[in-house]
Amino acid sequence: MSEMVHSRLKQGQGPAAAQQSFYPPGSPASVHKGATCFECDITFNNINNFYVHKRLYCSSRHQQGETGGLVKEGAVTAAAPPVSHAASPQARPVSRAASASPSCPDPAPGGTASEPKVVEVKIEDPGLKDATCSSSSEGEGPGGGQASEGSQSPSGSAEDQDDDPTRTFCQACNIRFSRHDNYIVHKRFYCASRHDPTNQRPHSGKAAFLPQPIRTRKRKKMYE
């Protein structure tokens, strides 16, 4: 209604023509200079105020806006089903994925297949250990055994000498013990040949003690 009034005002029609457009001819409201809004039950003395009310504040305008909103919502709902139909192809892959869900147990056979592999690895571990043991035993055969025998031969000879129950003298340290047991303990833990065989103490008879000359300090005389 307000748009029609504005269009007529722009075309140059007077307020009387606008008033006649709002009210049918012969109505009592058309006689008065003012105007009455029947939707809001308000009477205006100035027709311009009535136009402003109709344009901005009338409840019929809000009702028209609500009806327009309802129409827009109806259009949106009418347009919504095609969207749902358009989205249905996207939903179909989901349904296909859901239908393909029974194929999810496929990893289970893979898992079961992996379990025998783990068992096989566990079975192979003793074989690997046996192989390593056999290789180590082969390494310890002729060459390794000779190396070990060669490394233990000096200690074996020393132990053979230490096993003599009459031996109580340590040549490396030049110490004689009263008991053979003390000699054995000395050779096992404290002997210098055990730490460094080359570092043997010199015999007392061969080593000669050379005393150093004593140096005397000369005092300066205070009175010269």
UniProtKB/Swiss-Prot annotation:
Residues reported to bind Zn(2+) 1: 37, 40, 53, 58
Please state where this protein is localized: Nucleus
Alphabetized, the UniProt keywords read:
Activator, DNA-binding, Metal-binding, Nucleus, Repeat, Repressor, Transcription, Transcription regulation, Zinc, Zinc-finger
Report which gene this protein is encoded by.
zfpm1
Q: Where is Zn(2+) 2 bound in this sequence? A: 170, 173, 186, 191
Against InterPro entries, the record matches this protein to: FOG (IPR039746), ZF_CCHC_FOG (IPR034731), Znf_C2H2_sf (IPR036236)
Cellular component GO terms, alphabetically? nucleus
Which GO terms are recorded in the biological process aspect for this UniProt protein? heart development; heart looping; hemopoiesis; regulation of transcription by RNA polymerase II
Q: Annotated region Disordered: where?
A: 1-24, 81-165, 196-224
Q: What is this protein's record name? A: Zinc finger protein ZFPM1
Regarding protein family, the annotation reads: Belongs to the FOG (Friend of GATA) family.
- Which tissues and organs express this gene's product? Expressed at the lateral plate mesoderm.
List all Basic and acidic residues biased stretches: 117-128
This chain's source organism reads: Danio rerio
Record remark: domains: The CCHC FOG-type zinc fingers probably directly bind to GATA-type zinc fingers. The Tyr residue adjacent to the last Cys of the CCHC FOG-type zinc finger is probably essential for the interaction with GATA-type zinc fingers.
